[in-house]
């Protein structure tokens, strides 16, 4: 589902692994919906505009081999772009348009998708059957646009559930804690009671938009 913290989770992973979010390489796959988008991944061929610049993905990984690659909304990528990504997953490397071999052996590749987000909330429970049903529907939705050989090279599929109001309270608490140091520097001490957190979460809560 959308708005459940998929991207935020990847940022936290980068922070935990590298102590900052700089090694996070994020590509919005909605920008790679056309056939010619392949050149933006590995670079333009010789004689074409942008040849010297390298690919948006390969050049960043070449310069920062220890990184996390986030491919956001993978379902929007053109099939030719998916073929390039399949080669990366299969061989752990890719040759860019300038003939340089770029290794992905030290990268973590994360792909997010809203596949299966049309599943109604009522079918997503905490029971084993509810969780299993959600996984099966999500995997079926993934199979609608990803070839079997692509899915076979994915180490793990993580299914997110919609956030509850309790989750929103936890998020509000974390965001307020992050705000406190900045307020304290300005001589403001800020405390938030549980009742206030509950009201903040209630005002922000949304089943579909996150």
Where are these regions (language model features)?
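AAA+ P-loop NTPase nucleotide-binding core of proteostasis motors
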Residues: 1-210
């Amino acid at each position: 589902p959308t708005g459940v913290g998929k991207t935020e989770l990847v940022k936290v992973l980068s922070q935990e692994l590298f102590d900052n979010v700089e090694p996070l390489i994020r590509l919005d796959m909605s920008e790679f919906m056309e056939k010619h988008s392949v050149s933006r991944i590995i670079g333009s061929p010789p004689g074409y505009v942008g040849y010297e610049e390298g690919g948006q993905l390969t050049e960043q990984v070449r310069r920062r081999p220890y990184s996390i690659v986030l491919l956001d909304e993978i379902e929007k990528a053109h099939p030719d772009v998916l073929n390039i990504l399949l080669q990366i997953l299969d061989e752990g490397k890719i040759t860019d348009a300038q003939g340089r071999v770029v290794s992905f052996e030290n990268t973590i590749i994360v792909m997010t998708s809203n596949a299966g987000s049309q599943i109604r909330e009522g079918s997503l429970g905490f029971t084993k059957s509810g969780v299993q049903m959600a996984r099966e529907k999500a995997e079926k939705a993934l199979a609608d646009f990803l070839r079997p050989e692509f899915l076979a090279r994915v180490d793990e599929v993580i299914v997110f559930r919609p956030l509850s109001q309790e989750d929103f309270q936890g998020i509000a608490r974390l965001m307020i804690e992050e705000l406190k140091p900045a307020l304290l520097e300005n001589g403001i001490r800020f405390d938030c009671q549980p009742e206030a957190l509950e009201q903040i979460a209630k005002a922000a809560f949304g089943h579909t938009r996150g």
